[in-house]
């Protein structure tokens, strides 16, 4: 068992300090009592903070080697929150091969509110650099794209972004922190549709944002609290439970897809296979 596997099973806040329970209980309360007037409390209203959700968020941050994590009601809610830190007139460079829901959010919502978008092939660093404008604030991309599995180097893009004082935002849904931890390669913000591999059982709709520093954490938390697209305590518990088997599931899924690709390569009816996990394939 590796250090990462141990993190999957033993979350930072797994034990409940109130009861001694070895797993975090599901706290359904919407409001929390003050011990006395004016006393500082960790939670007062569940939209702003919930013990079950917080335990999950701390686990997400640990898996991605981040400073703070935030759990949302869907992957799109997470993407919305990450992009909402920008303001009217800001310019973003985005990958030209991104999830369709992200494309729709960018071009039919955020552009309408004044965010400027330029799509480029993020595998081409020269194309990224040529797209940088005085008002450019960030580069957003998927390291392995949905659905054609085109591969972009997080390390190279992040290095270019740092040269120009830009944020690097990575949608790590397809790889998960088991296969890639973008923050360790220079990224600033990582996004997940936790509905997919993190949950793993097709029974939770969830999203996650993990950030590298406190300044970004404060900005994302403000958006999470203001917009209210939080993950429920029940779904937070289900997602935390699914995360425990992430490495086991992905190991089996990787082995299965290699067998499938080997089989498809022998079929004359199949003209092209997109799978970067086998040498020689795009």
Model-derived regions: residue spans:
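Conserved N-terminal alpha-helix of the aminotransferase class I/II PLP-enzyme fold
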Residues: 31-80, 85, 101-110
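Conserved PLP-enzyme active-site core in the AAT-like
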Residues: 70-269, 274, 279-280
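Short clusters of hydrophobic/aromatic residues that line enzyme substrate/ligand-binding pockets
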Residues: 9, 45, 197-198
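A generic secondary-structure signal marking the coil-to-beta-strand transition
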Residues: 5, 22-26, 41, 68, ...
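Short, basic and Ser/Thr-rich N-terminal targeting/leader segments
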Residues: 21-22, 65, 113
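N-terminal amphipathic/basic leader segments beginning at the initiator methionine
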Residues: 1-38
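Short, hydrophobic/aliphatic alpha-helical segments
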Residues: 4-8, 58-61, 186-188
């Amino acid at each position: 068992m590796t250090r990462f596997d141990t993190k999957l099973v033993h979350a930072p806040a797994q034990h409940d300090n109130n009861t001694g329970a070895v797993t975090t209980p599901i706290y359904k309360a919407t409001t929390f009592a003050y011990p006395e007037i004016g006393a500082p409390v960790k939670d007062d209203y569940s939209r702003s903070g919930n013990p079950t959700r917080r335990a999950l968020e701390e686990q997400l941050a640990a898996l991605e080697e981040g400073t703070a994590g935030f759990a949302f009601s869907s992957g799109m809610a997470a993407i919305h929150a990450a992009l909402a830190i920008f303001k009217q007139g800001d310019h973003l460079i985005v990958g030209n091969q991104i999830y369709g829901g992200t494309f729709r959010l960018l071009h039919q919502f955020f552009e309408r509110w004044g965010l400027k978008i330029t799509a480029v092939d993020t595998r081409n660093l020269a194309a990224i650099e040529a797209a940088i404008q005085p008002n450019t604030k960030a580069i957003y991309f998927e390291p392995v794209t949905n659905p054609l599995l085109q591969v972009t180097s997080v390390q190279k893009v992040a290095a270019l972004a740092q040269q120009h004082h830009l944020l690097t935002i990575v949608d790590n849904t397809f790889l998960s922190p088991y296969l890639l931890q973008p923050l360790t390669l220079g990224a600033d913000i990582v996004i997940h549709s936790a509905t997919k591999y993190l949950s793993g059982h097709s029974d939770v709709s969830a999203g996650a944002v993990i950030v590298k520093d406190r300044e970004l954490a404060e900005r994302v938390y403000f958006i999470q609290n203001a917009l209210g697209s939080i993950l429920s305590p029940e779904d937070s518990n289900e997602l935390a439970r699914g995360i425990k088997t992430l490495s086991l599931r992905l190991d089996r899924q990787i082995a299965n897809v290699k067998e499938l690709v080997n089989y498809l390569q022998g079929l004359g009816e199949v003209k092209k296979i997109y799978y970067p996990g086998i040498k020689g394939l795009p």
